[in-house]
Amino acid sequence: MSETVPAASAGAVPAVMEKPLTKKRGKKPAGLTSASRKAPNLSVSKLITEALSVSQERVGMSLAALKKALAAAGYDVEKNNSRIKLSLKSLVNKGILVQTRGTGASGSFKLSKKVLPKSTRRKANKSASAKTKKLVLSRDSKSPKTAKTNKRAKKPRATAPKKAVRSGRKAKGAKGKQQQKSPVKARATKPKLTQHHKANIRKATSRK
């Protein structure tokens, strides 16, 4: 006799379908840009010149600061420490770099004026010209104030003699008026002779 397989009941739970396994992509390292990923392929000398062209330090960039800039660009500084020093020496010998401080690979470095691009030269010239203009403007702004103070000090000196001249004129005019008035007063004070006095004077003269 053949055995019959019991049919699956309608209420039975269906088997859970397994999801296909997907490969997880590795996360990109944080802080690295496209330029920094390509940095290991570039030569050390190019990276050094680029870092020095960006720096705005007049004295130059120290070796420690250079290493920090190279590490930020994605270059392995610890493994290639000797290569960095050799490239610095060769760049100094070629005249591309100028060593401002220290001796050998240790010290401060900056690009020579011949290697600097035109854009950086123009920026440096503009900054220098702007500083000189500010100094000239500050000097010009200070000079008018001193001139005004001198003018204010000179004004009372000019007005003082005018007052003295006017007072002298008034005094002279007053003296002249007094001299003119005084003889008039003297004439007025003389006693007038009456007819009686005149007759007495005539009698006195006839008796003599």
Swiss-Prot record:
A GO molecular-function descriptor: double-stranded DNA binding
GO BP: any one term: chromosome condensation
Record-annotated H15 domain positions: 40-113
Biased composition (Basic residues): 111-136, 148-157, 163-175, 187-208
One term under GO cellular component: nucleosome
Keyword DNA-binding assigned: yes
Positions carrying Citrulline: 58
PTM note: Phosphorylated in early spermatids.
Site (Important for nucleosome binding properties): 56
Phosphothreonine: modified positions: 159
UniProt keyword annotations, A-Z: Citrullination, Developmental protein, Differentiation, DNA-binding, Phosphoprotein, Spermatogenesis
Record's keyword annotation contains Phosphoprotein: yes
Pfam families: Linker_histone
UniProt-listed InterPro entries: H1/H5, Histone_H1/H5_H15, WH-like_DNA-bd_sf, WH_DNA-bd_sf
Sites of Phosphoserine modification: 9, 143, 167, 182
PROSITE patterns associated with the record: H15
Function: Testis-specific histone H1 that forms less compacted chromatin compared to other H1 histone subtypes. Formation of more relaxed chromatin may be required to promote chromatin architecture required for proper chromosome regulation during meiosis, such as homologous recombination. Histones H1 act as linkers that bind to nucleosomes and compact polynucleosomes into a higher-order chromatin configuration.
Protein name: Histone H1t
Organism of this sequence: Macaca mulatta (Rhesus macaque)
